[in-house]
Amino acid sequence: MHQPVMLEETIAMLKPHAKGRYLDGTVGLGGHSFAILQSAGDGAELCGLDQDKKALAIAEMTLKPFKKRVHLVHTKYSSFPLILKALGWKLLDGALIDIGVSSLQLDNAERGFSFLYDGPLDMRMDQDANNNSLFEIVNKSRQEYLKDIISRYGEEPQANRIAKAIVQKRRTKPITTTKELADLIEQAYPAAWRAKSRHHPATKTFQAFRIVVNSELNELEKFLNMIMGWIAPGGRVAVISFHSLEDRIVKQYMKSWTRSCICPPYVPVCKCFHKPEAILITKKPIRPSEKEISENIRSRSAKLRVAEKVLL
C-alpha cells in the first residue's frame, strides 16, 4: 500500500486554509491532496495533476469527499500553467510536487520500474506517451550514450562496464525484461564491489534509466522555472525529492528565489535593485522521522524543501 511521504510535515509546511487554491503536481493516489483539503477546511480548491492514468483513477476515488473542489487532469506537472489558465485560476496559495515513484508503479511488474520483479522494459510514467520506453533505450542506444547516462544520472562508478555488458548482450538477442537487465548489471559489477555494496548493483542504473525515459530532471527544471510566478504572497512551494540530482536542482532554484542582488561579482556596489521573490522556510531539508522510515523504508532518502513567496 502506498504511504504518502512526510505527510504531517508537508501539511505543516504548506499551512492550507479554507480560501486557498492549491496545486498537487504529482497527485499520485491522492494521499497528500486529501490531507491538504482536509486540513484546509471547506472552501479550499485543489488542482491535481499526474502522468499516470491508473493513479489518477485511484486518486479520484480517494478525493471523492471533496469532489466539487477537486480538479484532476492527466498531464505532466510542468504543464500546470495551461491547466490553471483553463480553470481561470490566477494565483496559488500553495504548490506541492513529490517526485518519487509510487508503490503502484514500483510494485507492478508490468510497469518495468523495479528490478525486484520480472517485467517488460517500459518505465514510462505515462503509458500513453510517445517517448521511448526503456526497451528502446537499452537496445538501440550507442555504448557511449549508455555510459554517459548511467554515469550522469545514476552517479554509477561502474557505468563503463555496465554499458559494455549491455551492448555485448544485445548483439546475440534483444534484452527484454527487467530481471534480464538487472542480472546482466550484477554480473558486470566486480565481485569485490558486489560484496561491499549495501544496495543491489542495478539500483543506480535503474534510477538513471528512469530519469532518462521520463525526462525527469528537465521536467523538474521547467516546473521550478515557472512556479514562483504563480504563487500568491504568503503562499508556499514544497518539493519532496529522493536523490541528490533532484535535490541539488531544487536547492539551487530556491536559493535563486531568495537572492537580493543579481549583479555580476565584479560590480562593487549593487545597481540591480533586485528584490528576492521568496524566503526559505527550510534552511536545511526536512527528513523523515525514524518512525516513518521503519514503517515505510522507501521514504528513507526523501528530502522536503519549502520556500514562501514574499510581497515584491
From Swiss-Prot:
* Gene3D superfamilies xrefs: Putative methyltransferase TM0872, insert domain, Vaccinia Virus protein VP39
Q: Which UniProt keywords apply?
A: Cytoplasm, Methyltransferase, rRNA processing, S-adenosyl-L-methionine, Transferase
Q: Tell me the domain of life.
A: Bacteria
Q: Does the keyword Ribonucleoprotein apply?
A: no
| Location, primary (coarse class) | cytoplasm
One Gene Ontology term from the biological process aspect of the record: rRNA base methylation
Q: Give the UniProt entry's GO cellular component terms.
A: cytoplasm
Catalysed reaction(s) here are: cytidine(1402) in 16S rRNA + S-adenosyl-L-methionine = N(4)-methylcytidine(1402) in 16S rRNA + S-adenosyl-L-homocysteine + H(+)
Q: Pfam families in the record, alphabetically?
A: Methyltransf_5
The GO molecular function terms of this record are: rRNA (cytosine-N4-)-methyltransferase activity
According to its UniProt record, this protein's enzyme class is: transferase
**Binding sites annotated in the UniProt record for S-adenosyl-L-methionine:** G30, G31, H32, D50, F80, D98, Q105
- Location(s), subcellular: Cytoplasm
Q: Do the record's keywords include Metal-binding?
A: no
In short, the EC number is 2.1.1.199
Tell me the protein family, please: Belongs to the methyltransferase superfamily. RsmH family.
In UniProt terms, what function does this protein have?
Answer: Specifically methylates the N4 position of cytidine in position 1402 (C1402) of 16S rRNA.
Q: What protein name applies here?
A: Ribosomal RNA small subunit methyltransferase H
What is the scientific name of the source organism? Lawsonia intracellularis (strain PHE/MN1-00)
Task: Cite the source lineage.
Answer: Bacteria, Pseudomonadati, Thermodesulfobacteriota, Desulfovibrionia, Desulfovibrionales
Q: Which gene encodes it?
A: rsmH
